[in-house]
């Protein structure tokens, strides 16, 4: 017959497993629903054209999203004419874009574009008031900007601020000028929209357009026009996908960890019950089936609740991702019935996998365990566990050594492997480490030889399994929290130092509220500027980041600048395309024209761009290009009028802020990962401590009968929890330390700079304090209830 205390202990452990499985399945369901939702929409400014023709795609690399290479000017015009002659087509309109932004506004990336007025026919919106632009100083703007026809407006362009008169307003984003003025500011043509006669079948026109285009483009109609959504949105969705995938995998892994540790501790506490079942004839197979049945029941209920919770919270999670920058604005999640079903099945499988070791341990209980009264763990470490723990620790040690000598690509993987292996190894070896480590940590208690101090020390050393089960989740959380946050912080500081050390300049002029510096702003700076653009090289016309530089480039980067028909490339680009110094490289530029340029130098891959061209070459072929930064090389500060939207800052400050948006996303990603792992730790710690406290009612009763006051009982339990959390934190730091020191050494070798370890103390303190607070609350509060019920 099962006692009330045993039943309470069992249901407490079941509750922890239920919550772990439910949360894991909820996270997997939400992540899968968002990942499988396309979320892309046809751009408003092109949605009015039933058929769109897109230029052929170039070679794309993972995580890098660039626009397709434009058609050559002559090819684009010939294709436009041929498409315009198709039956049912009223006109074929080329779409061009250039940088435009009303002064003193900070708009989203997709709204910082100007177009020729002819392209307004492709939009699904039209004029709200006023008329189209007729002269070069007239412009049509989005009415949400607050301008009315006849008002003057200053628009920032690549040339500098331009004064216009508003001739009309539209019900959608964008700036529209005369076609002639747009041709001077815009680059090449990537899209041609077909306007059809009323009643014309778009499918039939699309089929005819495909025959006319052949391999020179892609014909899009209907929902396939979503492929023309801004590449920035595609990149944002890709980043969000990486975040969701990492969170889902981490949730599945930690769910197995929590279920396994919780059931292992529960089985260890039910040895007497299992021994009694063996005494009355139960076979080992029946005991194993019993544990699996309990896990199946808990897993099924938890998975069902988690799948339902994931479906309900998926829209809320989508909103959070949009606000954080991991999904584009307007993204919507679509529900698919099979996703929660698959997540439910995954949750059940995870619960059964997690209980495997516990079921084997239950099947090995002997009938004599029914006679056992003491909570002493005579054999907390089995030979198999000791071998597995030493093997995992050895793998972690090898990975830590490899981290110190690995390159940049393998550095992160080896660091993560070091932490995971050491965490697993120390968790397996924890029962053997508890005695010596607890002895060292509780040595100060020996100076106060009172009953509570003795009980704290002996309880932890005697009940090794209980102590180890509580240590494990704290160890894992501290290890991963310290590793992730400190690695990110150390890497960012090292990257900032690398960028600052590579530049020889007095100061940096950077854009304020705009995506780049105009020619007017750059002209004020006595030094070197980097005119950002994209070029396409090789047979696959791979997109390459490029910059136009002037003669002052050599003073800043100590690299001879390209001049005339020459180009400078990085070593990785040269190796990928087979370019060597003195050879000729064929590059397609932003207006679609191809130029053959001689390679004059091959530079290190640490340079900020892959290709460097003469500045006038970039400006001739990309009228809308903007400079990311201009470095001042003279002692005197640069006077910058407010209308140029630029500021002068130190080189170190620019290096720290250069990747500010990327760093923000990285830290949000880090926060999400730490929050997920810390959340599961809260479940594991609370479940384990509650289970342990529920099973210690008899210990509390004995303490009271022995003369201990309620305050002494609570102090004993709280002190024991504090020591266990301290042990977990110490082992967690021990697991993360080799990976961190190896990473620092690897960065020093890779960058050739004095990189210092930067520990994220606020994160470490917060995680340890959270574990301590939660563990203490989960111990003291139930104990207070027990004390009130005792006579």
Regions found by a protein language model. Give the residues of each.
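Short cytosolic juxtamembrane segments of multi-pass membrane proteins
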Residues: 1, 364-379, 785-791
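Interfacial "coupling" helices/loops that link adjacent transmembrane helices in transporter permeases
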Residues: 6, 10-13, 255-299, 374-377, ...
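Membrane interfacial helix motifs at helix-loop boundaries and amphipathic/re-entrant anchors
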Residues: 34-48, 61-63, 223-253, 308-343, ...
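Small-residue-rich transmembrane alpha-helices
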Residues: 263, 296-326, 339-364, 399-403, ...
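Juxtamembrane segments of multi-pass membrane proteins
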Residues: 420, 425-426, 432-576, 581-594
């Amino acid at each position: 017959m099962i006692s009330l205390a045993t039943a309470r202990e069992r249901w407490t452990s079941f509750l922890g497993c239920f919550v772990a499985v439910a949360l894991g399945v909820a996270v997997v369901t939400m992540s899968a629903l968002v990942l499988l939702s396309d979320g892309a929409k046809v751009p408003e400014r092109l949605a009015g054209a039933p058929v769109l023709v897109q230029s052929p795609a170039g070679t794309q690399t993972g995580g890098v999203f660039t626009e397709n290479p434009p058609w050559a000017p002559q090819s684009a015009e010939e294709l436009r004419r041929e498409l315009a002659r198709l039956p049912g087509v009223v006109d074929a309109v080329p779409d061009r874009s250039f940088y435009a932004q009303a002064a003193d506004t900070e708009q989203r990336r997709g709204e910082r574009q100007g177009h020729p007025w002819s392209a307004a026919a492709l939009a699904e919106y039209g004029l709200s008031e006023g008329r189209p632009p007729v002269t070069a100083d007239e412009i049509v703007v989005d009415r949400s900007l607050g301008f009315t026809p006849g008002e003057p407006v200053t628009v920032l362009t690549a040339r500098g601020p331009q004064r216009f008169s508003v001739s009309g307003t539209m019900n959608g984003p964008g700036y529209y000028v005369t076609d002639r003025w747009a041709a001077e500011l815009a680059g090449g043509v990537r899209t041609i929209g077909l306007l059809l006669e009323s009643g014309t079948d778009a499918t039939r026109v699309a089929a005819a357009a495909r025959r006319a285009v052949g391999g020179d483009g892609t014909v899009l109609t209907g929902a396939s026009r979503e492929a023309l959504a801004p590449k920035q949105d595609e990149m944002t969705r890709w980043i969000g996908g990486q975040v969701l995938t990492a969170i889902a995998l981490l949730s599945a892994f930690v769910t197995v960890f929590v279920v396994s540790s919780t059931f292992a501790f529960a089985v260890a506490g039910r040895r007497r019950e299992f021994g009694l079942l063996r005494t009355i004839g139960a076979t080992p197979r029946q005991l194993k089936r019993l544990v699996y049945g309990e896990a199946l029941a808990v897993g099924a209920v938890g998975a069902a609740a988690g799948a339902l919770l994931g479906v309900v919270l998926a829209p809320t999670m989508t909103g959070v991702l949009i606000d954080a920058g991991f999904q584009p604005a307007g993204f919507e999640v679509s529900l698919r019935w099979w996703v929660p079903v698959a997540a439910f099945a995954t949750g059940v499988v995870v619960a059964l996998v997690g209980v495997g070791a516990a079921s084997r341990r239950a099947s090995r209980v002997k009938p004599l365990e029914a006679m056992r009264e003491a909570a002493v763990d005579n054999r907390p470490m089995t030979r198999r566990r000791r071998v597995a723990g030493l093997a995992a620790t050895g793998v972690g040690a090898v990975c830590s050594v490899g981290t110190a000598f690995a390159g940049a690509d393998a550095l992160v993987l080896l660091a993560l492997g070091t932490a995971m292996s050491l965490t697993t190894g120390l968790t397996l070896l924890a029962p053997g480490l508890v005695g010596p480590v607890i002895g060292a940590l509780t040595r100060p208690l020996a100076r106060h030889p009172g009953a509570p101090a003795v009980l704290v020390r002996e309880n932890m050393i005697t009940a090794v399994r209980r102590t180890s089960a509580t240590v494990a989740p704290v160890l894992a959380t501290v290890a991963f929290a310290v590793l992730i946050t400190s690695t990110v912080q150390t890497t960012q500081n090292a990257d900032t130092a690398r960028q600052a050390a590579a530049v020889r300049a007095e100061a940096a002029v950077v854009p304020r509220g705009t995506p780049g510096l105009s020619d007017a702003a750059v002209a004020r700076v006595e030094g070197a500027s980097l005119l950002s653009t994209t070029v396409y090289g090789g047979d696959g016309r791979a997109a390459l980041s490029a910059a136009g530089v002037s003669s002052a480039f050599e003073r800043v980067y100590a690299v001879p600048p390209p001049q005339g028909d020459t180009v400078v490339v990085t070593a990785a680009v040269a190796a990928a395309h087979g370019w060597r110094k003195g050879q000729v490289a064929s590059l397609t530029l932003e207006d679609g024209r191809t130029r053959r340029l001689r390679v004059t130098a091959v530079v290190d891959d640490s340079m900020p761009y892959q290709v460097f061209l003469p500045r006038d070459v970039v400006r001739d072929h990309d009228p809308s290009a903007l400079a990311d930064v201009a470095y001042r090389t003279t002692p005197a500060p640069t006077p910058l009028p407010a209308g140029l939207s630029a500021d002068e800052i130190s080189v170190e400050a620019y290096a720290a802020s250069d990747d500010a948006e990327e760093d923000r996303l990285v830290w949000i990603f880090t926060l999400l990962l730490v929050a997920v792992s810390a959340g599961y730790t809260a479940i594991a710690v609370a479940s384990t401590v509650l289970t342990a406290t529920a099973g210690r009612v008899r210990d509390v009763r004995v303490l009271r009968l022995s003369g201990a006051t309620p305050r002494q009982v609570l102090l004993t339990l709280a002190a024991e929890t504090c020591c266990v959390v301290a042990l977990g934190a110490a082992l967690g730091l021990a697991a993360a330390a080799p990976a961190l020191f190896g990473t620092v050494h690897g960065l020093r070798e890779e960058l050739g700079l004095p990189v210092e370890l930067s520990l994220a103390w606020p994160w470490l303190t917060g995680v340890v304090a959270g574990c301590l607070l939660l563990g203490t609350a989960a111990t003291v509060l139930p104990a207070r209830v027990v004390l009130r019920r005792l006579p």
